C-alpha cells in the first residue's frame, strides 16, 4: 500500500489529472451559489434569447436562464453519479468479499447468479426496471444501483480468492494469525486500490448512463435541471438555439473524458506488473 501511495504522489500527470477532476466536481457542487438567475423561473417572452448581460448563455424554450440551469444541472448530475458509484462500490465489494470468505456451496451458487446477471447488458436491465416501476430520477438511480454493484462483487471476489490462495496468507494462518486480522491487514489493503481504479473509471460510465436515460425521458423530470434532460429538451431546437445542445453535451463529454483519463492513469500506476 505504501509503495502504491508513493508511486501515485510521484506521478505528476496523475496528480494534475486528479487536481483538475477535483476542481471540476467541487466547482459544480458549489456553482449554484453563483447562478445569476433562478433555474426554473419561466419567462415566456424571453424564450430562446441569445447571450446577454442578463442571460450570459442565453435562455431555453421557456425563457429560463440557461447558465443557471447548467450550474444546477451539474450539481444534480454529479451528486447522483457520486452517490451511485460510492454505493455500488461499497456494496459490491462487501458482498464479494463475504462470498469469497464464506466459500462452499453458498459461494458457488452466488457466483453463478452473478454470471447470469452479468450476461445481460446492464442497460437492458435498467430499462426493464424503469418500465416496471416508472420514470423519475429516484427510480432510475435505484435501477442503476441494483444492477451495477454486481461488477464490483465479481472483481472483489476474484481478488480475495487470489490473495486467499497466496503463500503469505497461508503462512499467516499457520503462524496463528486470526482471519479478521488477515482480512484487514493483508486482504483489504490489496483489494481496495483495484476497486478505486474501477470506481474512478466507472464514474464517467455512470454519468453517461444517467444522462442517456434522462435524454430518453426516463430520468430527471421537469422542471429539475439535469444535463441529460437538458439535452432532451434542447434537441428540438437544434437549429434555432444550438447552445441548448452544445453546453450540456460538452460538459458531459469533458467529465467523462477526464475521469476516464484519471482512471487509466491510476490503473497504470497500480498495475501489479509494475510493483
What is each PLM-predicted segment?
Residues 1-37, 113, 191:
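N-terminal signal-anchor/first transmembrane alpha helix
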Residues 27-62, 216-224:
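Hydrophobic alpha-helical transmembrane segments of membrane transport/permease proteins
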Residues 56, 60, 92, 100-106, ...:
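Generic hydrophobic transmembrane alpha-helix motif, especially the helices
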Residues 59-64, 101-102, 171-190, 231:
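Short helix-to-coil transition segments within interhelical loops
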Residues 66-101:
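Transmembrane alpha-helix signature in integral membrane proteins
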Residues 85, 93, 97, 135-185, ...:
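Membrane-cytosol interface at the C-terminal ends of specific transmembrane alpha-helices
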Residues 130-132, 144, 160, 208-251:
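Glycine-rich helix-loop "coupling/hinge" segments at transmembrane-helix boundaries
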Residues 146-147, 193-203, 242-275:
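C-terminal transmembrane helix and the adjacent membrane-cytosol boundary/short C-terminal tail
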